[in-house]
């Protein structure tokens, strides 16, 4: 089979057309409590088991890091016939390695998951990778936004700035007010989905149409940030 494409393209890739398979699955070793979201992806791709014949899947922290490998999201993935080694800078690095494993995995004629032998070293070139939803056109639905966040995770993006101009609680006339119950629940859903995909959900405020440059409105802005904090938002 041809080598699969990896998106986005990693910094360094050396892959063989030879493939490894683990008919008895993999057993975890190394890090005691790897990231739950990353492990969910890994379990979707590989069979994780306590079988004594399973091959090792070892997760460790990167050592002797270059400056690039100290960046959030950096990882080193080594696949040999006997094991898989993943060395990571942080939980985001493990999540990105898991996304790469999903793209590399194929199924053979016997139903076994196979992976190409090789080494992948990857790290981000830029600290903030993502989008601003701030346009004035047709608004995205809540489902659209959830799907966008999942796409960002797959593409190893880490920033989503929420600022749709059809949202009157982000902009005028209601930016000073709390979100109603339904919309507040949707914000919570977006924050949760963003976190599961290692995306920073950034809530933007757009008060320019009617803000008064007074101490009162300064406090209104801070109070609104407090309301959003209570909904789970941590970036503004």
Question: Where on the chain are the PLM-derived regions?
Answer:
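Acidic, contiguous N-terminal accessory segments
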Residues: 1-92, 100, 104-121
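Feature activates predominantly on carbohydrate-active enzymes
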Residues: 71-72, 78-235
């Amino acid at each position: 089979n041809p080598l699969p494409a990896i998106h986005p393209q990693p910094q360094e890739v050396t892959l063989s057309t030879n493939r490894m398979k683990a008919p008895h699955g993999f057993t975890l070793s190394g890090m005691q409590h790897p990231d739950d979201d990353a492990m969910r992806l890994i379990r979707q791709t590989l069979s994780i088991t306590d079988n004594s014949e399973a091959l090792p899947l070892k997760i460790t922290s990167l050592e002797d890091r270059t400056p690039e490998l100290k960046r959030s999201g950096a990882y080193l993935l080594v696949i040999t016939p006997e094991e898989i080694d993943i060395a990571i800078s942080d939980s985001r690095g493990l999540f990105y390695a898991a996304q790469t494993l999903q793209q590399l995995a194929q199924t053979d004629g016997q139903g076994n998951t196979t992976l190409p032998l090789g080494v992948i070293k990857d790290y981000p070139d830029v600290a903030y990778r993502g989008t601003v939803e701030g346009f004035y056109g047709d608004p995205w639905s809540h489902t659209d936004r959830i799907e966008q966040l999942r796409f960002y995770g797959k593409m190893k993006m880490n920033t989503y700035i929420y600022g749709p101009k059809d949202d009157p609680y982000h902009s005028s006339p209601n930016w000073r007010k709390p979100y109603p119950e339904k919309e507040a629940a949707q914000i919570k859903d977006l924050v949760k989905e963003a976190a599961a995909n290692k995306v920073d959900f950034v809530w933007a405020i757009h008060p320019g149409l009617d803000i008064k440059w007074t101490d009162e409105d300064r406090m209104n802005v801070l109070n609104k940030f407090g309301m959003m904090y209570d909904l789970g938002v941590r970036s503004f």
